[in-house]
Amino acid sequence: MRNIIYFILSLLFSVTSYALETINIEHGRADPTPIAVNKFDADNSAADVLGHDMVKVISNDLKLSGLFRPISAASFIEEKTGIEYKPLFAAWRQINASLLVNGEVTKLESGKFQISFILWDTLLEKQLVGEILEVPKNLWRRAAHKIADKIYEKITGDAGYFDTKIVYVSESSSLPKIKRIALMDYDGANNKYLTNGKSLVLTPRFARSADKIFYVSYATKRRVLVYEKDLKTGKESVVGDFPGISFAPRFSPDGRKAVMSIAKNGSTHIYEIDLATKRLHKLTDGFGINTSPSYSPDGKKIVYNSDRNGVPQLYIMNSDGSDVQRISFGGGSYAAPSWSPRGDYIAFTKITKGDGGKTFNIGIMKACPQDDKNSERIITSGYLVESPCWSPNGRVIMFAKGWPSSAKAPGKNKIFAIDLTGHNEREIMTPADASDPEWSGVLN
């Protein structure tokens, strides 16, 4: 059987074209591509259960992206499953499935599972992509995410983002409020708490490798510590005691340095720390509040916000603090800039005032404002929307969204995701209130 699988998959790489047009997810909203994720064939009951669960995760990943429309299995006409046969394409076209995913799960003598899949174009009747994965049972969800990533990449031309993690601050709804650092899959599954709730914690950040996080903890009202936590071993260590720090550091692409804002003598400035020597280097000067620094993907520039001209605006400087340029020119106050991993856009929070009071907005602008000073675009607004962060492919933004208390319901805070086009806004389910999300890179 394995030889047959390898033979079939070897045919994939001779395919150079297919009927579907590549989806461009920057050009506004497009109709989702209909896709059928067929039942995965299995060699025993354990593999059958695993395959059933994987189909649900793959379908959900593709649906959440907003670019695919999984077709209900109740509509399927063809009854054959697995990857060892050529599909009856006319039957899939009859239910308007442009794409078809067939798969197979086999339990190996080692106890691991071999998972194989093929993505078909039903219009040209050709294979597009396929792969064989070998995973222990406890990693079956990651295998499903990886398959969805492969499908997403083949059809959009961009890397997928499903095999990723989110770290965030979880807050209990009952009094006294308990804040804990929590970790979950990008879709809200596998939620677990990383801190015990005994101290106030804020702004968790992933290290570049995604196997460590850093966060701010208030040991006392006056003592603020930055902690490093190894997600593989669970061990914690103190990076430093930084009086006046308000946000956890953000890390350079090479992982050797980090930037943070620290308040001293009535002013708040941006500092860079060498993680090996723990030496601090001040990057901004003058009076005012300079905060929320974020590196560009190549590490050569830093975006941050500053009220040096009276109202918080966004600025870019070289990573050594030179060549400062203002990049925001609209009305309102700007905060929390986050540079896209692709380097093309910067996301931000913007606060505007009107007759109804303050409105919070999440927006994006081009990272090279000299090319277009009118590139700013608001993609969502609300009573409280803040803390934007990017998917590793730079095509989705995750953020925190809050609602005020009312006579009928208490206030709440949740995590949402939205495409950079401003479409497909959806909630990421968490067991309690949630804020300060941070998106990992694709896992190894």
UniProtKB/Swiss-Prot annotation:
GO terms for cellular component: periplasmic space. It is found in: Periplasm. InterPro entries: 6-blade_b-propeller_TolB-like (IPR011042), PD40 (IPR011659), Tol-Pal_TolB (IPR014167), TolB_N (IPR007195). SUPFAM superfamilies: TolB, N-terminal domain, Tricorn protease N-terminal domain. Residues 1-19 form the signal peptide. The keyword Cell division applies. The keyword Cell division applies. Gene3D superfamilies: TolB, C-terminal domain (2.120.10.30), TolB, N-terminal domain (3.40.50.10070). One of its GO terms (biological process) is cell division. Keywords: Cell cycle, Cell division, Periplasm, Signal. Belongs to the TolB family. The Tol-Pal system is composed of five core proteins: the inner membrane proteins TolA, TolQ and TolR, the periplasmic protein TolB and the outer membrane protein Pal. They form a network linking the inner and outer membranes and the peptidoglycan layer. PANTHER family: PROTEIN TOLB (PTHR36842:SF1), PROTEIN TOLB HOMOLOG (PTHR36842). HAMAP family: TolB. Part of the Tol-Pal system, which plays a role in outer membrane invagination during cell division and is important for maintaining outer membrane integrity. This is Tol-Pal system protein TolB. It comes from Rickettsia peacockii (strain Rustic).
